[in-house]
Regions:
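Short, charged, surface-exposed hinge/linker loops at domain edges
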Residues: 15-23, 50-78
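Conserved AMP-binding/adenylate-forming core of the ANL superfamily
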Residues: 35, 81-82, 95, 99-153, ...
């Protein structure tokens, strides 16, 4: 028997049940979501996507599955930056904490949805002013500072693909 090929890994039969501790802390206390998804997973995920996300254009096909390729929510268009920020501010949650940032000991910040949206829009305008537009690609080389998610969400907001490059470490000279 030779080495396995990629095709040998197309089917996964193992299951990985959550721990009791994880299950106890879950937001769902019954199995109704699981049962609904098991009965008709495409309808389940279509409903979840329409209820939980804001779509600029609705999708016409929930799943186009042609092994080993899958396309979810075919024909749909959304802006993930708007889904991460705008919808929460518009729902009156702008003063809620979007994320907590912790740097060096004692260096912390709480960033609200409204503040984050403001920063993201301002940086998206900077990127647009530099000539970046939908379909362009950028690499973001920044440390883990509060401005990193601002840069990422600003790129997402204007349709610029981005890759984050972290400095793993360097020798002290």
């Amino acid at each position: 028997m030779g080495e396995p090929t990629i095709e040998d890994y197309y089917v996964e039969d193992r299951t990985f049940p959550p721990s009791e501790q994880f299950t106890a802390a879950a937001l769902l206390s019954d199995t109704s979501h699981h049962e609904e998804a098991a009965a008709d997973y495409e309808a389940f995920w279509a409903r979840q996507a329409r209820e939980l996300l804001t779509w600029d254009e609705d999708f016409h096909t929930t799943l186009d599955w042609d092994l080993p390729f899958a396309q979810w929510f075919v024909g749909g268009k959304l802006n993930m930056s708007a889904n991460c920020l705008d919808r929460h501010v518009e729902a009156g949650l702008g003063d809620r904490i979007a994320y907590f940032w912790e740097g060096e000991p004692g260096d912390t910040r709480e960033i609200t949805y409204a503040d984050l949206l403001d920063e993201v829009c301002r940086f998206a305008n900077v990127l647009t002013g530099l000539g970046l537009e939908r379909g362009d690609r950028v690499a973001i080389y920044m440390p883990m500072i509060p401005e990193l998610p601002v840069a990422m969400l600003a790129c997402t907001r204007i349709g610029v693909a981005h890759s984050v490059v972290f400095e793993i470490g360097r020798a002290h000279v």
